[in-house]
Amino acid sequence: SKEQKNRFIQKFTFPNVKDGSIIEYQYQLNSPFLQLLDKTYLEFDIPVIYEEYIFDFPKFFGYNYNFQGGLMPKYKEDQAQMMYGQDYYSLRLGFENVPPFKAENFVKNDRNYITNIRPELNSTNFNNLFKSYATTWDDVRDKLKEYDDFGGQLSKKSLARNVLSQDIMNIPIPKEKASKILKFVQSTYTWDGNVGLFTGDGIKSLIDTKIGNSAEINLYLIMLMREAGLNVSPMIMNTVNRGILNIAFPTIGAPNYVVACLEDNGNYYLYDATSKFSLPNLLPPRAYNYNAILLKDKKAEILQINNFIESKTYLNVDAKLNEDTTFEGNFKDRDTKTFAILAYDEYVDNKQDYEKKYKERYTFNFNNYKSEVVNDNEFQTSFDFNTDGFVDGVGGKLIFNPLLFLYRQNHEFNQTEERKYPIEFLSPYETVKKVTITIPDNYKF
């Protein structure tokens, strides 16, 4: 089945598989993409008795092996041999008794830590004519300028003329002007959910339809900022789902995302208009993945990006204890900054599933459920409740937990086994719980 423009999925099944069954399979991948092959992951969520990785290629190709992870092969062969009637090089890696990969809380992408290998072409030698494919990020910058669906789009300056209001154009402070342009793009154009370094239908289509992929929206954001006289460059990176960008192996095929970067008084400010809730220097969580490359006019600069803006969750319960021992009241769950981006995007993606999440988390009866934008860039869900499930009667006394349904017996840092991977937060965060309880006049604590 076709998953994306250049990707297909092949599925197969094993009949009569039961707990404890040992399955065996082999597959061969033939790729026309000689320069950058896909990663092959060598750890799974099931134990593996034996697995083997084989990479064969003609001797006139030269490859580097980008090997990442903590799993070491028990057997390794890297040698020349005769195959298919000509000289080949062959890499064979054998792994025995591989334990299952165990995921841990507070890890953005498990695949960053799963052992994998990726061959990358570094040279060819046809008829003693040697050609090196080793590149730098400056080379990548130069090539992207030539690509019609990247640099070619940025060069269409006429698409950004006479678009912004004169009020925006006249703002003297660069950061304030950039913020207004970000707001304009967010309110005018809508991201279609597709991530990419390159445009799909092009920026002209974005202008006509008001919908586009991430590259179309953010490249147009760059064009508008430049038209307004700002010093703005594209910054390319990997999204979290793509894995950390390996800066040691520069290639156009690695990054899959681009945002706008304003340089002002020696400082950098990042902008991403794909999310309606993003702010200056507050990107959607998918974009915070450590390594990034800033494509300046004359050079490429390697940067590290992290989210240092604190997000807060405010959980507010205003409850009344009735004389029949029921509780009634109102609950508000309000998120700010990164948490607001996540909540809003999840809500817009599927409103029914978002409400279902609350019904599964809070199993008592509630009504007047509402999710909405509040205070400009905050997202809030609220509901009213009436339940008899919070109070126990013991010896003529009524006993209830003062946090009511906000009480949690376990926390997310309850891992008992030794931790293997770094703790990764989407942002610094704080959770504030406030519970106000009104009791009948003739009751006392």
Q: Which stretches of residues belong to each language-model region?
A:
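A sensor for short, sequence-defined functional sites
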Residues: 1-445
